[in-house]
Amino acid sequence: MEEKQKSLSPPPCPSTVTVRRNPPRRARATPFTTTTKPPLSSLACAKPHDVPTFPIDEILSIQIPQSEPKPAIAESLKIFLRIKPLRTFTKVTTTTKSRPRNVWPQNPSKKNNAKENRNPEITKKVRKKDEEACITLNDSYSVTLTPPQSLQELKRSKTEVYEGFSHVFPADCSQNDVYDKMVQPLLEDFMKGKSGMLAALGPSGSGKTHTVFGSLKDPGIVPITLRQIFKKNDESCSGSLRSFNLSIFEICSERGKGEKAYDLLGGESSELSVQQSTIRGLKEVPIQNLEEAESLIGQAMLKRATATTNSNSQSSRSQCIINIRASCNGFSNETKLQSSDAMLTIVDLAGAEREKRTGNQAIDFGLPGTDPYFILFLMPTIPLTMNTRYLLAVTVGVPEEPKEGIAETSSKFFGSLTRYLRDYLEGKKRMALILTVKAGEEDYLDTSYLLRQASPYMKIKFDNTEEPCNKRQLKTFPRAEKNKKIKLSAPKTSQIEENFQGERCQISQEVNLQGKKADPTDRSSPRLEHVAQDKNEREHIIMRNFSKVLWNVLKQCNEKLKVAEGEIFTLKDSLRREQLKSLGLETELISLKSSCLAQPCIPEVEVIVNAKEHFEVDAALTNERNVDDDSCNLIKARREAGAEESSETPVPKVVRNVDDDSCNLIKARREAGAEESSESPVLSVLRNVDDDSCNLIEARREAGSEESSKSPVPNVRNVDVDSCNLINPRREASTEESSESPVLSKNVKDAELVPCHLSSENDAEPRQSVNSEENVGIPSTITHVEAEVTDFQRDQNQDDPTPSPEQVEVSQDCINSGLSNVQTKSAISRRFPDSEKQERNRRLLPASSRSLTEEMNDLEIKDIQTEKQQVKTTNTRVQKKAVSIQGQETEVPPREAEPASTKKQKNGQKPKRRLQPASSVLLTREINTLEIEDDIAEPKVNRGGKKTTVSQPRSQGSVTLLRLLTNNLHL
């Protein structure tokens, strides 16, 4: 077995080993192409291959040369001392009295005493001797403190020498000297990315604030530091890659209370909360130039808490901290690394001194030796590093554990400032102190106390360790940010090419940074890239603001468009309404024009006129009398002329047509039945008359055409009588009408009936009993002709059966006028239906005329009924009435003078008369033109008293025409 193991042992490893990173090897076969596995017996029989082992021991035994670590640089705490120059006191005196010119010489000694006694106000200019300095400068690193003579006599103090200062500034030094020695090293480290702090402490009036801030003529540390920062930033190549921010706040410690922090660059109530080395709510203002920084510092100084003490008129009562933060936005070619944000802190502490001497009420801790220079006791109260603690315990003699009183005082009243300055007090960051003292004899105690407390800390040393950079060394490529910023606009090809080229440049830059050496001359690419990035960001901001403005403008336009659309809609609606109104007005205008064309003459009706207008009535009646006289004379002349003229006068064929229509209507009424005759006895009388007239018409037709051609005039002889007389026979029934109509009797008082023009035909509905087409069924043509001869036929037909030529001519005129009215009415009925005509008539007729027309219709109906009652009496009365009509002219007195029953005057004298037009004929024309439908015809009584068997009602016109034809048959 041992032999087998020896044979299987690998050969010895050579002295040199070559390791290939990627050795060539063949690809393995896929499992589908592999052959069947050989049996285990064959594997056992096969000899194993000789595989050498990996030489781990040799590799581990190789010694790699390591770089020697740099020894830590032990630096001592830098403490500077500045001595304030002494002050000289001068008193200027003025004399109120001048010496007179002419005086006797006096003793000089007596003269001086007399002046002092007499004039105590008079003083003289006395220069006080220079104050003796209690501190003297030995060299740049040590001073000697000498007590004044008063203290030396009492043997309370001795001369002391203090050494170990980083530098001592004499009284005649300038602000630039202080900056060069103390601030310049801190500023250089700050520009390289290292943080640092500078604190100024000392008694009130020693020059702390003057050293830190200075004045306009002699600026202090802070203004000079800012000036140098911007100057170096402009000179350096990486200046554009660094930005600066400024923040100023104060921490106030009040008596018996804790601490409060306030932001001096914020608003009025800008209280802060201190959390370790960070302050929540602190405002950082970016600064671009020196002017902005100086204006911010001046604004903060005005808000700082100050108070008046015995040693200074404006003593700082708070701890003022000024922070200047530098942030790097790119790569620094000097350091070849991206450094973290650096902070330069300058602290102006409050004035600290003995309370009894200065009257300072701001700080009083009750513990001796802890109130003025608390910062010197902060280091023992916080956990320091091992090195710092060891140095404090061995070299200085500071106990490792601080005293209880000091720890309580520091933690209670300086907790905020202690936590904020923790990194500097532990030695992690660089810190420098400047002590300001006064060299006067009066300030010996404060100066001695300050130097004794600061002397142990001059020997403290700490390791200057580099802070590790927490940020990444390489800047990531901002592709996602660019995509986010270019959301509003579509990417262009030029932009895509620029981005690709920028990526390539940055990748090559990263490769160069990873190498050992980089080209120091190549400084343009990061700067150009940063400039391009700033330009893109600026363009993005401009486009975003422009898009916001454009969106607001579009919103305003949209609102205005909505308002305009609403106004357009209202205007369209109003326009539509106006169009409808205009259409209605046009329709009404057309109807008015058609009515005016269809009715050339305005009908006349009788209306009730007030008694005040009697003079107009008299004038109308006078004209009517003249017309009646002329017409009567004309008729008499024609009667004397003979029958020859009557044969020559042409008569239209309308009478024959009227006879035919009336005969047909009478036959139709007979077939209607006997129901109406039983209901109204008056209609039965009319039917009897129609029967007789129908028989007479048939007999007349048999006579032939010779009769009509030779003498057509006798058929209408009796038509002229009423139109010749033009006297209303219904005057006889005026008394009965006034008694029957109470409404009319009220309106008839002090009034007369006169002709009047009306423009409406719709209000004649009360006259339905006189002329009705709907109930009777007679056409308008027959009704119109018959109505003209209705009233006059009752009286004239009995007296004079034989017509005269004058009567025939007058009747011819009446028939022609009736035919013209019939044609006008038929034209109107074709154009307008009955419903439209009635609606138009109602609209055109005024309310007053309607009421008057109704009253007149009632009056006329009652007149007709009165006449019919008079016809029923006797034939004798009818004959007398006919004689009176032919021989005499009827007098028409006023309505008020009419008796209850009118009678004809039998005397031979011709009374005064008032003639009126044939009102019945005029009213009939108006009613026929307007197609007013009447009720059932008024009851009539036959002369012989016989009742007809015809049950169908007849109109007044047809009865009158039949009576006319009957009277003319026997001629």
Curated annotation (Swiss-Prot):
Residues 903-915 have a biased composition (Basic residues). Residues 76-460 form the Kinesin motor domain. ATP binds at G202, P203, S204, G205, S206, G207, K208, T209. Residues 768-783, 809-827 have a biased composition (Polar residues). Disulfide bonds: none annotated. GO terms for biological process: microtubule-based movement. Keywords: ATP-binding, Microtubule, Motor protein, Nucleotide-binding. It comes from the Eukaryota. GO terms for molecular function: ATP binding; ATP hydrolysis activity; microtubule binding; microtubule motor activity. PROSITE patterns: KINESIN_MOTOR_1, KINESIN_MOTOR_2. Residues 1-44, 93-121, 700-856, 872-917 are annotated as: Disordered. The keyword Nucleotide-binding applies. SMART domains: KISc (SM00129). Residues 700-709, 785-797, 831-842 have a biased composition (Basic and acidic residues). Residues 29-39 have a biased composition (Low complexity). GO terms for cellular component: cytoplasm; kinesin complex; microtubule; nucleus. InterPro entries: Kinesin-like_fam, Kinesin_motor_CS, Kinesin_motor_dom, Kinesin_motor_dom_sf, P-loop_NTPase. Belongs to the TRAFAC class myosin-kinesin ATPase superfamily. Kinesin family. KIN-6 subfamily. This is Kinesin-like protein KIN-6. The gene is KIN6.
